[in-house]
Amino acid sequence: MKDKKPDTEKPSKYDHLEKMSISELLLNINNEDKTVPQKIEEVLPNIESLIEVIVAKMKQGGRLFYIGAGTSGRLGVLDASECPPTYGVSDNMVIGLIAGGDYALRKAVENAEDDTEQAWKDLQEYDIEKNDVLVGIAASGTTPYVIGGIKDARKNGITTGCITCSSDSPLARASEYPIEVV
């Protein structure tokens, strides 16, 4: 079965941002920002389910891992880095990994997102195990690095979730607890 085009790649009124005035750009960004709370509200039950399983696993000594590529990976690393000072948890309770490694936080690492096996190798460096939870982050829901990591984690009995901005994506189908904000 051929996968449909990700929602993030469908035609939209934003295909030609370069033709908009600064005022039009700002107005459109602001209008899109206004839609976020409603879109989040629509998936609150899914968010709750994922959080419940993460909390249960952490109570058993488990950790939360994020994997992503590009901006999605950076957001996972950012969230993980904020957990110790904000919530007083240890540095190894929430771990963010980005395709291409730490170098990719500041510079693009071309094609790192296309390696379906690298995420699992990266996760093994942290001794990921069955008490842990892996959350894949990919706006399109099609990033091979993230999908490969989720699939390998599931094969090894690790609970998986995802955050994506495309409905019925390969990533959402591979995850046990998908969150699709569309």
Please give the residue ranges for each predicted region.
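Short, positively charged patches
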Residues: 8-11, 48-52, 63
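Short secondary-structure boundary/capping elements
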Residues: 17-21, 46, 111-118
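A short, well-structured juxtamembrane/interface segment
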Residues: 42-57
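N-terminal glycine-rich phosphate/adenylate-binding segment common to multiple enzyme folds
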Residues: 53, 57-65, 75
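Short gly/ser-rich anion-binding loops that grip negatively charged ligand groups
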Residues: 37, 44, 105-109
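Cofactor-/ligand-binding subdomain signature composed of acidic, glycine-rich
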Residues: 1-39, 43
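Glycine-rich phosphate-binding loops that contact phosphosugars or nucleotide phosphates
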Residues: 65, 69-182
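Structured helix-beta-strand junction loops
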Residues: 32, 60-61, 174
